[in-house]
A protein has these predicted regions:
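Acidic donor-binding segment of Leloir-type glycosyltransferases
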Residues: 1-26
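C-terminal catalytic/acceptor-binding lobe
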Residues: 130-214
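Glycine-rich, basic loop-to-helix element that forms the pyrophosphate-binding segment
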Residues: 24-40
């Protein structure tokens, strides 16, 4: 995470950076994000949830931070997601500016960097911790946000840069379980009652306690 932490130190100064790991045997990204938010005492404090391998641009991030304080929504400080992969990451490591590194454009990306308050995050249930290993927790979260808050996560014009990391298998029993759970989210799209029931059934995060009654 050093490249990401270095970027934040250089651009935002002495900010509170917390590294979160849930300790699950099978990596659980949704749980890591939820734990990070749950560690914030002030429900109105603006928080940046940043994957360990993703670097934002400064101006979109600052815009998202300012807006997230009052919008009641989660903000994504980008409209373009550049996956640098091995070649682009090697270029960056060698000193090439991020905006000049080779990349693959990932269409529809809704992960990497989130800007929110705890109140906004939990207002639509956070992320579903039943997603484990690779896949779908971000897409399911996006659908829940759209359905329960009547608006998609709000984007800010800009780019995020995802550095190379080892890919996880997109097959097997856990992947199939993730895909099946994602299908439930698709079926609940635009049905507020169905979505609330689906999100609230993620008891691992005690969602029923956090999700508002109406």
């Amino acid at each position: 995470m050093s490249a990401v932490e270095d970027w934040y130190r250089q651009n935002l100064g002495d900010v509170d950076i917390r590294t979160i790991d849930s300790g699950d045997e099978v990596f659980n990204l949704a749980r890591c994000r939820n734990l990070g938010i749950d560690s914030i005492a002030d429900a109105g404090e603006v928080v940046v949830i940043n994957d360990a391998d993703t670097i934002p641009q400064l101006e979109p991030l600052l815009g998202a931070i300012a807006a997230a304080a009052t919008s009641g929504l989660v903000h994504l400080p980008y409209t373009r997601y550049h996956w640098l992969g091995t070649p682009g990451t090697a270029q960056f490591t060698a000193g090439t500016p991020l905006d000049r590194c080779d990349y693959e454009l990932v269409k529809g990306a809704c992960s990497g960097v989130y800007v929110t308050t705890p109140q906004s995050w939990w207002s639509h249930g956070g992320q579903d911790e039943r997603f484990r290993g690779w896949g779908f927790e971000d897409a399911a979260w996006y659908v829940a946000h759209e359905t329960l808050l009547d608006e998609a996560p709000r984007r800010h014009e800009g780019v995020v840069y995802a550095l190379h990391h080892a890919a996880q298998a997109r097959e097997g029993d856990q992947y199939d379980a993730n895909a099946a759970l994602m299908e439930q989210y698709r079926e609940a799209r635009s049905n507020r009652d169905a979505m609330r029931q689906l999100v609230g059934s993620d008891v691992t995060a005690e969602k029923a306690r956090r999700l508002p009654a109406s």
